[in-house]
C-alpha cells in the first residue's frame, strides 16, 4: 500500500513537470519572452514616417496663404463697419386719436344742443320737457297728459298757467323756471294779452302737445316693455320648469337604468360565483378522486392483514413513496375477519417522505465501513 501511494505521488509530479509542447503544457517563461520581444521590436521607420507626415500637415495648415487670411479678416471688419444699424422700431403703436376726437365733438354737439335748449328754457314748455326727460318714471302721470291737452286750446291762459304749475310740481327744484312760467302767465293779463301772450301761449301749447304725446308714447313704451319683460319672464319660468321636469325625468330614467345595470351586474357576479363554486366542487371531487386508493390494491392489502385489522389505522403498505392504509368502520367493529368486505373499511392514501434520509443513512454507513476496512488493512 505504501508503494502504491509513492507511485501515485511520483506519477502526479512527473505529469506536472514533464515539458510537452502540445496542448496547454507550454513553457511560460518562453511565452513571456516572446511577448516582450514582439512588443519591444516595433518598426521605428513607420513611427518616424508618421511623425514626419503629422508635422508636415501641421506646417501646411498653419503656413498656407497667410496673406489671403489677413485679407479675409480685413474684409469681415470692413463689412461690419459698413453695415448700417437698423433703427429700433417702437412696437407699441398707439391707435389714432380719431375716435376720441369724434367723441369730444359729439359731446360738444350735445352740449351745444343743451345750450340751445337752455336758451329756449324761457318758453316754459322746455322746462316741463327737461323735467320729464330727467324723470323718466314720472312721464306716465295722467294729470300731466291732461294739462298738455288743455294747453292745446291756445286762448286759455289760465290753462297755460296750470300747465306751468304742473311743470313746477314735476320739477320741484327748478323754482326759477316756475317763476318764469308764472310771469309768462301773468303777462297774459297785461297789454300783451292780445298779441304776444297769445303767440307765446300758442307756442307753449304746441310744445306741450308734443310733450304730452311724448309722455304718452313713453308710457306706452314702458308698458310694452314691462309686458314684454313679464312675458319673457313667464316664458323663461315655463322653460325652466319644463327643463327641470325633463331633467328630473332623465335623472329618474338614468337611475332606473343604473339600478337595472347594477342588478344585472350583481346577477352576473352571483352566477360567476356560483360557477366558481361549481368549479371548486369539481376540483374537490378531482382531489378526492386523486386521494382515493386503487380498489385492487385495497383488496390485496386487506387479504394480508385481515386477521389484525381493527378500528385503528393500519401501517402504510409501503415504506417509501405512496401507499394505502385502512381501518374498520364503527359499524363493522364486531364483524368477524372472514366477513369483512371493502365496504366495511375506511381507506386513504398514505405518503412516506423520509426516503432520502434513509438513503443518506445507508450511504454514510457504507462510507464508514469502507474507511474502517481500509484502516484495518493498512
Curated annotation (Swiss-Prot):
A lipid is attached at residue 355 (GPI-anchor amidated cysteine). Residues 304-356 form the TSP type-1 domain. Residues 50-291 are annotated as: Disordered. Residues 99-206 are annotated as: 18 X 6 AA tandem repeats of D-G-A-R-A-[EA]. Residues 212-277 are annotated as: 6 X 11 AA tandem repeats of G-N-[QR]-[AE]-G-G-Q-A-G-A-G. It is a lipid-anchor; GPI-anchor. Residues 356-378 form a propeptide. Sequence repeats lie at residues 99-104, 105-110, 111-116, 117-122, 123-128, 129-134, 135-140, 141-146, 147-152, 153-158, 159-164, 165-170, 171-176, 177-182, 183-188, 189-194, 195-200, 201-206, 212-222, 223-233, 234-244, 245-255, 256-266, 267-277. During host cell invasion, proteolytically cleaved at the cell membrane in the region I by a papain-like cysteine protease of parasite origin. Cleavage is triggered by the sporozoite contact with highly sulfated heparan sulfate proteoglycans (HSPGs) present on the host hepatocyte cell surface. Cleavage exposes the TSP type-1 (TSR) domain and is required for productive invasion of host hepatocytes but not for adhesion to the host cell membrane. Cleavage is dispensable for sporozoite development in the oocyst, motility and for traversal of host and vector cells. O-glycosylated; maybe by POFUT2. Residues 127-140, 163-200 have a biased composition (Low complexity). Essential sporozoite protein. In the mosquito vector, required for sporozoite development in the oocyst, migration through the vector hemolymph and entry into the vector salivary glands. In the vertebrate host, required for sporozoite migration through the host dermis and infection of host hepatocytes. Binds to highly sulfated heparan sulfate proteoglycans (HSPGs) on the surface of host hepatocytes. Belongs to the plasmodium circumsporozoite protein family. The N-terminus is involved in the initial binding to heparan sulfate proteoglycans (HSPGs) on the surface of host hepatocytes. The N-terminus masks the TSP type-1 (TSR) domain which maintains the sporozoites in a migratory state, enabling them to complete their journey to the salivary gland in the mosquito vector and then to the host liver. The unmasking of the TSP type-1 (TSR) domain when the sporozoite interacts with the host hepatocyte also protects sporozoites from host antibodies. This is Circumsporozoite protein. The lineage of its organism: Eukaryota, Sar, Alveolata, Apicomplexa, Aconoidasida. The gene is CSP.
